[in-house]
From Swiss-Prot:
PROSITE patterns in the record: G_TR_2 (PS51722), IF2 (PS01176)
Signal peptide span: none
Protein known as: Translation initiation factor IF-2
Family to which the UniProt record says this protein belongs: Belongs to the TRAFAC class translation factor GTPase superfamily. Classic translation factor GTPase family. IF-2 subfamily.
Function: One of the essential components for the initiation of protein synthesis. Protects formylmethionyl-tRNA from spontaneous hydrolysis and promotes its binding to the 30S ribosomal subunits. Also involved in the hydrolysis of GTP during the formation of the 70S ribosomal complex.
Organism in which the protein naturally occurs: Geobacter sulfurreducens (strain ATCC 51573 / DSM 12127 / PCA)
Region (G2): 417-421
Region (G5): 528-530
Region (Disordered): 118-261
Chief location of this protein within or outside the cell: cytoplasm
Location(s) in or outside the cell: Cytoplasm
Length: 883
């Protein structure tokens, strides 16, 4: 036996630490506390029963509880004097089997600790002690109550109750040995217990009489308490177990009954077959029900599933009565990687449902079909005024030309009408009207084109005679060509001495705009907005172009138009400028525009006058929307309010579904996959660079990459930073933007992220060409990506001896981090790219500086810093390849 702590021994003996400490001190064993270590001989000493006869009442009671338990069974099994005579002789005498049995039971409880001392005591103990001990409990019943308080060791059962005490001794055995629940469940069965004893003890000649003792126990035991409690009593609880009956007959019967019932249940569940007796009818019903389910086939009408627009995988599986995993497996075989919440369109749902014997019926309302414009009879068409948009560089006199045209054709009291910001107005010339749209620059024009709004009939391109073609002029030409709108060029400021109209004509030839004088088809008019020169000629050319286009519309039908612009007015609510394109709009008409509906409550023309109706090509301000519509939305007049609300609600639902499965703009990584699927034949690109030579070289190199599978189109190229206009053009044309030694403006970056436009930035031209080539071949492997950190403006430059120039900066966006990669921009052109050598704030080195603070930044091996420069810091991230 190894060394043991006091608290461990107390736990094994089932007594408190204090009680064990008291007993150890009474035995002369020096211990300090419950953590003290006991040697093997000390453990034997404290667990062994004392040999001296009891001298006082209390001591006698304690000794009785420690030593008599093994012999109390003899006293209980026979008359009071029989144990005295039976115990006195040696172990070999006739009653000895009972005594030996008791010894065996004690050993069974704690074989490692108690077996040696018990064996020695059974051989050498004097006869008087057992006699006195056996007689004493019979004469002193109070000891029975104190017995639970003084158990000396786990193997010795301290209950002085006859047979129950012995049973509890066996119950305590699982607390120490491994098979815990086994003795507890079979407490009343004698044969299993005997087998346990035979496994633990050495062969003993007294094994046979044990059943006789058990029979006697059964005979002398009072009626048992309810068996229910017996089944759930924990083996380590002697108190509860002591009250349980010693008889095992009833327990055996109940246990056997339970086993039989359990086996029957298992057979019914796992091995269904012909049964007799209880449960036969239920099983027969279940079997017959199963057969019916197998042969049942849904009716033809039930095999039709009605869906609207789309349906999720989970919903389709539920309606067909199949598992979603089976449906997903079929879709994966068809090459679709989907989840249970993935929406399926009608075609895909029809295809997969046919695999399971179902049909799909599309019950969706095709709103576009319902609202589609019916072609008009030629006799019902009448001429309509042309819709003209004036575009051009801001400094080239676009606003002045608009003011000059309005002032020449509007009464004096309405000269300031341009400040009403209605966005559209009418001009009359010789009894004919012209509608001008005051769109907010190129951005709105491109946005309307991106939404498919074919509003503008003619574009007037304003170019200053003294400046020539400017970047915004190039963009305006590209926008007009992309929209398929004819262009009339107005060369403004011809009254200036430095005006060179011929140079403007020559520069515009690069874009395919050749003057009629030089054998082309483009109309050029030289005007002066300030001096009112050639304004009538310009309007006549507009009407001439309109006659060539033969613009007509039917006024006698429900109105259709386009939202030019919209706003939320505090007093009037949502207000929109509507350009009526066909039909006539009247007050009181119900309408739908995009996801909004409403009723026309009031209309105003461009001069602010209330009107009751508006015909084709007439711009009016409409009040009565339920919400603010988007520019470019189609405005449709309806007869029924209910129908208008239904259409608006349907569009809102469709918009939500579209946003959930939003189609992102094409990036280089996705190009190869789309080519493989045959979805893309053209790749549009916008090229921006720091010098014109780079623009031309890159554009030409990209055009040479075009093949039969992919045609690469450079739809726009110019010098300068990447602007919001470039992003809008790329979004509308599904193009990518390539930048060389230029950076996007902050607003352009945010807008590109929102629109999903892919912007690629390079320092070397051949890298861009190689990337495009790899993308077309499906070999693009992007591994490095730049992460933008912050932007700072240089407000002061300090010269520090032995260090160089230090830039005093104000952090505009993000944060500056020491030792980060930096880029110095001057007029949005990259001047330097390298590493940040120092970052200080108030002469202290800092790790980073956040937005809104000032700091000093030093660039590694670079001193050419000027006030107004911009410093960007960034870091390079390694991104896993995704194709």
């Amino acid at each position: 036996m190894s060394k043991t702590h006091v608290y461990e021994l107390a736990k094994k003996m089932g007594i408190e630490n204090k009680e064990l400490l008291t007993r150890l001190k009474s035995l002369g064993i020096e211990v300090k506390n419950h953590l003290s270590v006991l040697e093997e001989d000390e453990i034997l000493k404290v667990t062994a029963p004392p040999a001296a006869p009891p001298k006082s009442g209390p001591q006698e009671e304690v000794r009785v509880t420690t030593t008599v338990i093994r012999r109390r069974r003899v006293a209980e099994a026979a008359p009071a004097e029989t144990p005295v005579e039976a115990v006195a002789p040696p172990v070999e005498s006739a009653p000895a089997p009972l005594e030996v049995e008791a010894v065996e039971e004690a050993v069974v409880q704690a074989p490692p600790v108690v077996e040696p001392p018990v064996a020695r005591e059974s051989e050498a103990a004097p006869a008087e002690e057992p006699v006195a001990a056996a007689v004493k409990p019979a004469s002193e019943p109070p000891v029975v109550q104190k017995a639970p308080v003084a158990p000396a060791a786990p193997p010795v059962d301290d209950k002085p109750t006859a047979n129950k005490a012995r049973i509890l001794g066996r119950v305590e055995l699982p607390g120490i040995t491994t098979p815990a629940p086994k003795p507890a469940d079979r407490r009343e069965a004698t044969a299993p217990k005997k087998r346990i004893e035979e496994r633990i003890m050495t062969p003993s000649p007294t094994d046979r009489p044990a059943p006789a003792g058990d029979d006697r126990r059964k005979a002398g035991t009072p009626p048992p308490p309810p068996r229910k409690g017996k089944e759930f009593v924990a083996p380590a609880e002697p108190e509860r177990g002591a009250k349980k009956p010693g008889g095992g007959g009833a327990g055996k019967k109940k246990e056997a009954f339970k086993k039989t019932e359990l086996l029957e249940k298992r057979e019914r569940i796992f091995e269904p077959g012909p049964k007799t007796g209880k449960g036969k009818k239920r099983e027969r019903d279940m079997v017959s029900l199963g057969r019916k389910t197998e042969i049942t086939v849904p009716k033809a009408i039930k095999r039709i599933i009605k869906i609207s627009e789309s349906i999720t995988v989970g919903e389709l599986a539920k309606r067909m009565g199949v598992k979603a995993t089976d449906l997903i497996r079929v879709l994966m075989k068809m090459g679709m990687m989907v989840t249970i919440n993935h929406p399926l369109d009608v075609d895909t749902a029809t295809l997969v449902a046919s695999e399971f014997g179902y049909e799909i019926e599309n019950v969706a309302i095709d709103v576009d079909e319902m609202l589609e414009s019916v072609p008009d009879a030629p006799e019902s068409l009448t001429k309509r005024p042309p819709v003209v948009t004036i575009m051009g560089h801001v400094d080239h006199g676009k606003t002045s030309l608009l003011d000059a045209i309005r002032e020449a054709n509007v009464i004096a009291g309405e000269a300031g009408g341009i400040t009403q910001h209605i966005g559209a107005y009418d001009v009359e010339l010789n009894g004919r009207k012209i509608t001008f749209l005051d769109t907010p620059g190129h951005e709105a024009f491109t946005a309307m084109r991106a939404r498919g709004a074919k509003v503008t009939d003619i574009v007037i391109l304003v170019v200053a005679a003294d400046d020539g073609v400017m970047p915004q002029t190039r963009e305006a030409v590209n926008h007009s060509k992309a929209a398929g709108v004819p262009i009339i060029v107005a060369i403004n400021k011809i009254d200036k001495p430095e005006a060179k109209p011929e140079r403007v004509k020559q520069e515009l030839m690069e874009f395919g705009l050749v003057s009629e004088e030089w054998g082309g088809e483009t109309i050029f008019v030289e005007v002066s907005a300030k001096k009112r020169i050639n304004l009538p000629e310009l309007l006549e050319m507009v009407l001439l172009q309109a006659d060539v286009m033969d613009l007509k519309a039917n006024p006698d039908k429900d109105a259709r138009g386009t939202i030019v612009e919209a706003k939320l007015d505090r007093g009037r609510g949502p207000v929109a400028t509507v350009l009526v394109q066909e039909g006539t709009l009247k007050i009181g008409d119900y309408f739908v525009a995009g996801v909004n509906s409403g009723r026309v409550r009031a209309m105003q023309n461009d001069r602010g006058d209330k009107v009751n109706e508006a015909g084709p090509s007439m711009p009016v301000e409409v009040i009565g929307f339920t919400g603010v519509p988007d520019a470019g939305d189609v405005f449709i007049s309806l007869v029924d309010e209910k129908r208008a609300k239904e259409i608006a609600s349907h569009r809102q639902q469709k918009l939500r579904e579209t946003e959930l499965a939003k189609h992102s703009k094409m990036s280089l990584e996705q190009l190869y996959d789309k080519i493989q699927k045959g979805e893309v034949k053209d790749l549009n690109a916008i090229v921006k660079a720091d010098v014109q030579g780079s623009v031309e070289a890159v554009s030409e190199s990209l055009r040479k990459l075009s093949t039969d599978a992919v045609r690469l189109n450079v739809i726009h190229s110019s010098v300068g930073a990447i602007t919001e206009t470039d992003v809008n053009l790329a979004s509308a044309s599904n193009a990518i933007i390539l930048g060389f030694n230029v950076r996007p403006e902050p607003k352009a970056s945010a807008h590109a992220e929102k629109e999903g436009v892919d912007i690629r930035l390079y320092n070397i031209i051949y890298d861009a060409v190689e990337d495009i080539k790899k993308a077309m071949e499906g070999l693009l492997e992007p591994t490095l990506r730049e992460k933008y950190l912050g932007r700072a403006e240089v407000r002061e430059v300090f010269s520090v001896p032995k260090v160089g120039n230090v830039a005093g900066c104000y952090i505009q966006d993000g944060k500056m981090i020491r030792n980060a990669q930096v880029r110095l921009l001057r007029d949005n052109v990259v001047i330097y790219e390298g590493k940040m050598s120092s970052l200080r704030r108030f002469k202290d080195d800092v790790k980073e500086v956040a937005t809104g603070y000032e700091c000093g930044i030093g660039l590694e091996n670079y001193n050419d810093i000027k006030v107004g420069d911009v410093i960007e810091d960034f870091e390079i991230e390694k991104i896993a390849t995704t194709l």
